[in-house]
């Protein structure tokens, strides 16, 4: 089966291509009775849309969302919700030079070898443009999680290239185009990106996402563990090459006496597990980090081959993000929210009536 759908009970199926007439998604399984307007979704899309600063692609897309179904008189009906976002600023002529060649680092070669046909315009189906519908669906998931359980899903940039971004306060995240939680470091990030763009090169980034207020019990062992589904969803984001839950790869150097989060009547002591044990949420913050590779489209000539297997030199034109990580924060937030709402509904379906005598301890003992 083709892999265009995410989720089990709350499913999202995306459609469209970068330079097609429109992109969008169909959400199935959204509970009825939730107030929902296009403005609720647009607010999240505006955080991701291109052309918002000199540090991202200058493709000008309003990303205005249309709700085609599943909402009546401002309330979800429980039927499929179709979201449509029209493409308005395609410039396909910029890709005429790669009709017969493959861009290094892109999905051109693999899509061609798998399907025997590819839409070369802006990467077609493999373009990060297709993350817009994910953010639209994520807005629906975020709203339901917040209103039903008080769950908040927030993210920020924790590193841009070799520059670490120390966390100061959540209030800074919405005040700069990098989603940096530290206002003092923004000038350094801007200078770094200006120099990078002048060199015609690109760089990667690290994004951290935190879900707070998640109840204990979400997750379906053994093959649909909460952290496993989170990792899969995050790896589905374009350019993501690594995922960490909690301490992640730092766990390798930690002793068991350090890594194991002790339990006390007052709460957990530490959260190295990232809010998940045995594939089930603990009630602590769920913490996720993703590593995003440098953008493959750069101005430097690159070696490649033609469809006939002959050597070729590829020069990439078009409008591209020198760091796709700059706009990735709302995408990562949306992916986490989509996994959480799916598991919330799955838990309710099987274990909604389960009660134990053990009190639910706090996420932190401090």
Curated annotation (Swiss-Prot):
**Pathway assigned to this chain's UniProt record:** Metabolic intermediate biosynthesis; chorismate biosynthesis; chorismate from D-erythrose 4-phosphate and phosphoenolpyruvate: step 7/7
Which reactions fall under this protein's catalytic activity?
5-O-(1-carboxyvinyl)-3-phosphoshikimate = chorismate + phosphate
Q: What are the coiled-coil residue ranges?
A: none
Q: Which cofactor does it need?
A: FMNH2
Q: Please, which domain of life does this record's source organism belong to?
A: Bacteria
* Residues that, per the record, bind NADP(+): 48, 54
What note does UniProt attach to the cofactor annotation?
Answer: Reduced FMN (FMNH(2)).
**Which GO molecular-function terms appear in the entry?**
chorismate synthase activity; FMN binding
What InterPro entries does the record tag this protein with? Chorismate_synth, Chorismate_synth_AroC_sf, Chorismate_synthase_CS
Output the Gene Ontology cellular-component terms: cytosol
Positions annotated to bind FMN: 125-127, 238-239, 278, 293-297, 319
What EC identifiers does the entry list?
4.2.3.5
Give UniProt keywords alphabetically. Answer: Amino-acid biosynthesis, Aromatic amino acid biosynthesis, FAD, Flavoprotein, FMN, Lyase, NADP
Name its GO BP terms in alphabetical order: amino acid biosynthetic process; aromatic amino acid family biosynthetic process; chorismate biosynthetic process
Whom does it interact with, and what assembly results? Answer: Homotetramer.
Q: Which family does it belong to?
A: Belongs to the chorismate synthase family.
What this protein is reported to do is described as: This reaction introduces a second double bond into the aromatic ring system.
User: What's the name of the protein?
Assistant: Chorismate synthase
Origin species = Burkholderia multivorans (strain ATCC 17616 / 249)
What taxonomic ancestry is recorded? Bacteria, Pseudomonadati, Pseudomonadota, Betaproteobacteria, Burkholderiales
- Gene for this protein? aroC
